[in-house]
Amino acid sequence: MSLRNLLQENSLNFQDIFYKDCEVFVELLQKWGKVHNLSGRLSDDDIYENILDSLYPLNFIDEFSSFADIGTGAGYPGLILAIARKDVKSYLIEPRVKRVAFLNFVKASLGLNNLTILQKRAENVEGLEVDLITSRAVTNTNLLLNITSKIKKEYTSYLFYKGSMLEDEIETSKISNYKVVSRCERNYLYIKGKKC
């Protein structure tokens, strides 16, 4: 199935330039991934599924004008969100050199002027405040909330791409004002920033 069809089946519609950019991303990830071990799953279908996984929450989260993705790795979800939402100021926070080199190469190849890549650990980032903080498969929810405390604004929302241990993490984190949306094996935890 084509990427366009896969996304459209999930109520995600984008202009042609997005799909062209994704073709470049797929090609670059497949080339770099084999050499630098960026991702274990490099078939077109696997990458398309990861792109869908990255974008699916756009169906249910609130609008945002900036976001920071913690531990972007090979580009999921942050780089994909930056490609899809060029109107949004995007920050990818990734400490590993090889992954940062790949992310910078994709940024340059696609001319992503909305994107800033920070080679740091999240807890060491200062002087940045965003509307939305995302993370996929980095660590537990409680630790994510703690290590991102310096980059959140008063009303920052969180979007964490989680697996099966989510109920325990929610209880441990003592969060409120959240919703969980499930798709296949994925649980998306959306913690809405509070407005008083």
Model-predicted segments: where are they?
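Residue-level preference for alpha-helix termini and adjacent loops
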Residues: 13, 37-41, 75, 124, ...
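Conserved beta-strand/loop positions that form the S-adenosyl-L-methionine
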Residues: 70-72
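Conserved SAM-binding loop of SAM-dependent methyltransferases across substrates and taxa
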Residues: 74-87
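Class I SAM-dependent transferase core
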Residues: 1-64, 68, 98-115
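N-terminal cationic-hydrophobic initiation segments that often serve targeting/anchoring roles
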Residues: 58-59, 82, 149
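Conserved active-site region of classical short-chain dehydrogenase/reductase
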Residues: 55, 79, 142
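S-adenosylmethionine
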Residues: 88-91, 95-196
